[in-house]
């Protein structure tokens, strides 16, 4: 499904109705300078197990592993970034992937290694 429209309403519609394989690509975050030099890639989709640094918002400066990627809500959940509810339980704070920087990649998946090699050129 190719997106050619500049109309904000159609851009929003595409975002809301995007299939999961397209949403995964939209969940990209920039890599740190060290990783960028090492892998020759500027950004990658965030995955569970990646270590990220939060760059914007109330939790700016926090670092932790990604524990969940929520494709439905376009949010990620980071270890150690929690809020306490009134009843005392801890809940993860949802963060948009554009507000984080990947500082360590989870390379357990062979397919991901191949994706990085392919994108590096």
Swiss-Prot record:
The UniProt keywords, alphabetically, are: Ribonucleoprotein, Ribosomal protein, RNA-binding, rRNA-binding
Give the domain of life: Archaea
GO terms classed as biological process = translation
The terms describing its cellular component in GO are: large ribosomal subunit
The record's annotation in PROSITE patterns points to: RIBOSOMAL_L24 (PS01108)
One GO molecular-function entry = structural constituent of ribosome
Alphabetical list of Pfam families matching this protein: KOW, Ribosomal_L26
InterPro entries on file: KOW, Rib_uL2_dom2, Ribosomal_uL24_CS, Ribosomal_uL24_euk/arc, Ribosomal_uL24_KOW, Translation_prot_SH3-like_sf
Q: Which SMART domains match?
A: KOW (SM00739)
Q: What does this protein do?
A: One of two assembly initiator proteins, it binds directly to the 5'-end of the 23S rRNA, where it nucleates assembly of the 50S subunit. Located at the polypeptide exit tunnel on the outside of the subunit.
Q: What interactions and quaternary structure are annotated? A: Part of the 50S ribosomal subunit.
Record family assignment: Belongs to the universal ribosomal protein uL24 family.
Descriptive protein name? Large ribosomal subunit protein uL24
The organism encoding this protein is Pyrococcus horikoshii (strain ATCC 700860 / DSM 12428 / JCM 9974 / NBRC 100139 / OT-3)
| Gene name for this UniProt entry | rpl24
């Amino acid at each position: 499904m190719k997106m050619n429209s500049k109309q904000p309403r159609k851009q929003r519609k595409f975002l809301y109705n995007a299939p999961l394989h397209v949403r995964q690509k939209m969940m990209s975050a920039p890599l740190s300078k060290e990783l960028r030099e090492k892998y020759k890639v500027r950004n990658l989709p965030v995955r569970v197990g990646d270590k990220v640094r939060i760059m914007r918002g109330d939790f700016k400066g926090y670092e932790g592993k990604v524990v969940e990627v929520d494709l439905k809500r376009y949010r990620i959940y980071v270890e150690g970034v929690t809020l306490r509810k009134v009843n005392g339980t801890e809940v993860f704070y949802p963060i948009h992937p554009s507000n984080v920087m990947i500082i360590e990649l989870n390379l357990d998946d062979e397919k991901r290694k191949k994706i990085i090699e392919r994108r590096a050129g």
